[in-house]
């Protein structure tokens, strides 16, 4: 597995370009199980970054709806969704290799075959590898909220990102977001409502109840016990 999660970019004079990232690379130590999974299961389920469009039918060996999840953490929810929906294809992106290893291990243990994973910057993957109009759904669950005002620009949900996702969705495809930080939920709602080509799938034009398709994470369960809220947003690409 290539450990370069960001491709270097340069201006016309050869100077490195600085791009605002929505994540900080925190490489924790791999457990033996995670390393074993990367060594043995990555060749089957892993996808290396290349700056060229993916053939999604060839990647999965069939033509089926593709759900892309950005930042799957340790992968338990993603594996559960893939197992529950064998008629769909799932592609997960995560920049932290321990999470990728944990996801691969869980997928192997559950016998999941309709899942592929990447370890790279999701924005670059969307820009370079995902064909326009190819995705059934894009999922972004509990991204870093970047609480401090001076860091708000690092939030992944911004107008250019929403427009990028829109291009990659099929007509009628859905961008599903969830956050447990209300100011970020409000920010998401404001951004998404401003981008032409989306429709808010909430009857009240704000948030939706958690759909059954999104498993409740352990982190979320703990938050519920502490009285914390969670906000789900679903925006569809206008047909």
Swiss-Prot record:
Top-rank lineage group of the source organism: Bacteria
GO molecular-function term, one example from the UniProt record: tRNA (guanine(46)-N7)-methyltransferase activity
Transmembrane domains' residue ranges: none
UniProt-annotated binding residues for S-adenosyl-L-methionine: 69, 94, 121, 144
Positions contributing to substrate binding: 148, 180, 217-220
Catalytic activity, EC: 2.1.1.33
InterPro entries associated with the record: SAM-dependent_MTases_sf (IPR029063), tRNA_(Gua-N-7)_MeTrfase_Trmb (IPR003358), tRNA_methyltr_TrmB_bact (IPR055361)
Keywords recorded for this protein, A-Z: Methyltransferase, S-adenosyl-L-methionine, Transferase, tRNA processing
Class of enzymatic activity (EC top level): transferase
Gene3D superfamilies referenced in this protein's UniProt entry, alphabetically: Vaccinia Virus protein VP39 (3.40.50.150)
Pfam families: Methyltransf_4 (PF02390)
HAMAP family listed in its UniProt record: tRNA_methyltr_TrmB
Subunit structure: Monomer.
UniProt record similarity statement: Belongs to the class I-like SAM-binding methyltransferase superfamily. TrmB family.
UniProt protein name: tRNA (guanine-N(7)-)-methyltransferase
Organism: Cronobacter sakazakii (strain ATCC BAA-894) (Enterobacter sakazakii)
Origin organism lineage: Bacteria, Pseudomonadati, Pseudomonadota, Gammaproteobacteria, Enterobacterales
């Amino acid at each position: 597995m290539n450990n370069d999660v960001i491709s270097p970019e340069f201006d016309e004079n050869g100077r490195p370009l600085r791009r605002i990232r929505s994540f900080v690379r925190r490489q924790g130590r791999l457990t033996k199980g995670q390393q074993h999974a990367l060594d043995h299961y990555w060749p089957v389920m892993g996808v290396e970054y290349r700056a060229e469009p993916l053939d999604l039918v060839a990647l999965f060996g069939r033509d089926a709806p593709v759900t892309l999840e950005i930042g799957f953490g340790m992968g338990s929810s993603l594996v559960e969704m893939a197992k529950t929906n064998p008629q769909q294809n799932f592609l997960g992106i995560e920049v932290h290799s321990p999470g990728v290893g944990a996801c691969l291990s869980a997928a192997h243990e559950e016998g999941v075959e309709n899942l592929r994973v990447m370890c790279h910057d999701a924005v670059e993957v969307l820009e370079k590898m995902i064909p326009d109009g190819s995705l059934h759904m894009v999922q972004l669950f509990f991204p870093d909220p970047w609480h401090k005002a001076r860091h708000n620009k690092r939030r992944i949900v911004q107008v250019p990102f929403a427009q990028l996702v829109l291009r990659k969705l099929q007509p009628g495809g859905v961008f599903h977001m969830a956050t447990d930080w209300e100011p970020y939920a409000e920010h998401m709602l404001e951004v998404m409502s401003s981008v032409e080509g989306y429709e808010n799938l909430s009857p009240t034009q704000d948030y939706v109840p958690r759909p059954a398709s999104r498993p409740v994470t352990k982190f979320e369960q703990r938050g519920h016990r502490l009285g914390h809220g969670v906000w789900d947003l679903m925006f569809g690409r206008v047909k």
